Regions:
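C-terminal catalytic domains of large/alpha subunits in multi-subunit enzymes
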Residues: 1-119
């Protein structure tokens, strides 16, 4: 996975422009659905990594509504390029969740590339 991002030096805001993902899931039975699973996993993980937070006080969760809960919105979603590694002689493997594991590391590398600083 590779991510292209920029960082606003004044605010520290990170903007992800493009994500490229090569994904090996063995026999690809339904390529369109596999791509949709991977795209959803990437967008959800970018949102968790960049914005999402459950806030607490001393006694309870204070994040109680979705209106103020920060998530990645459609206008902020990056272009996502997916290359499926099709291995027709192998059994089908997982498609969606595996893409999530590499997003935070690829994002950290993109921030390093943009700023020269490690998170």
């Amino acid at each position: 996975m590779a991510i292209e991002a920029s960082v606003d030096r004044a605010t520290g805001a990170i903007r992800v422009h493009r994500v490229a993902c090569a994904h090996d899931c063995g026999l690809v039975v339904n390529p369109g659905m596999v791509r949709a699973q991977i795209e959803g996993s990437i967008v959800q993980t970018l949102s968790r990594t960049l914005f999402e937070e459950v806030a607490f006080d001393r006694a309870r969760v204070t994040s109680v509504d979705w209106q103020r809960y920060p998530i990645l919105t459609f206008p902020d979603a990056p272009q996502i390029l997916i290359d499926l590694v099709h291995r027709p002689h192998d059994p089908p493997l997982g498609a969606g969740e595996a893409a999530a594991t590499t997003v935070p590391a690829a994002l950290a590398n993109a921030v390093f590339d943009a700023t020269g600083a490690r998170l």
